[in-house]
From Swiss-Prot:
InterPro entries: Ribosomal_uL14, Ribosomal_uL14_bac-type, Ribosomal_uL14_CS, Ribosomal_uL14_sf. GO terms for cellular component: cytosolic large ribosomal subunit. SUPFAM superfamilies: Ribosomal protein L14. GO terms for molecular function: large ribosomal subunit rRNA binding; structural constituent of ribosome. Part of the 50S ribosomal subunit. Forms a cluster with proteins L3 and L19. In the 70S ribosome, L14 and L19 interact and together make contacts with the 16S rRNA in bridges B5 and B8. Pfam families: Ribosomal_L14. Keywords: Ribonucleoprotein, Ribosomal protein, RNA-binding, rRNA-binding. Gene3D superfamilies: Ribosomal protein L14. This is Large ribosomal subunit protein uL14. Binds to 23S rRNA. Forms part of two intersubunit bridges in the 70S ribosome. The gene is rplN.
């Protein structure tokens, strides 16, 4: 579960390495985010030659979470880290590459471009 002030790894090549969650989008009392949810983030650590800079505020979609994801088939899935991909307003990634596996739930939520760029979909 991702909430306010959670630190996330960035799984793309925008230059950001770590971001902090400012807001979980989707309602006034929404507290937690999981795979496929959009959050507003602030860049905490970044490479000097990247697309985004430290302190920049942008939107991101969650692609991996440590907490178990239970599917309708009864299977559960969890990852080793909490990670996100920085996106534009039209739900397309700002970077051109995705690092590491992503969850299949992203395809159902309309992030097919991220799924197609990912090296592995679980």
């Amino acid at each position: 579960m991702i909430q306010f002030m959670t630190k996330l790894n960035v799984a793309d090549n925008t230059g950001a390495k770590q971001v902090g969650v400012i807001k979980v989008l989707g309602g006034t009392k929404r507290r937690y985010a999981s795979v496929g949810d959009i959050v507003v983030v602030s860049v905490k650590k970044a490479q000097p030659d990247g697309i985004v800079r430290k302190g920049q505020v942008c939107k991101a979609v969650i692609v991996r979470v440590k907490k178990n994801i239970t599917r309708s088939s009864g299977n559960s899935l969890s990852f080793d880290d909490n990670a996100c991909v920085i996106i534009k307003e039209d739900k397309t990634p700002r970077g051109s590459r995705i690092f590491g596996p992503v969850a299949r739930e992203l395809r159902d939520k309309g992030f097919s471009k991220i799924v197609s760029l990912a090296p592995e979909v679980l």
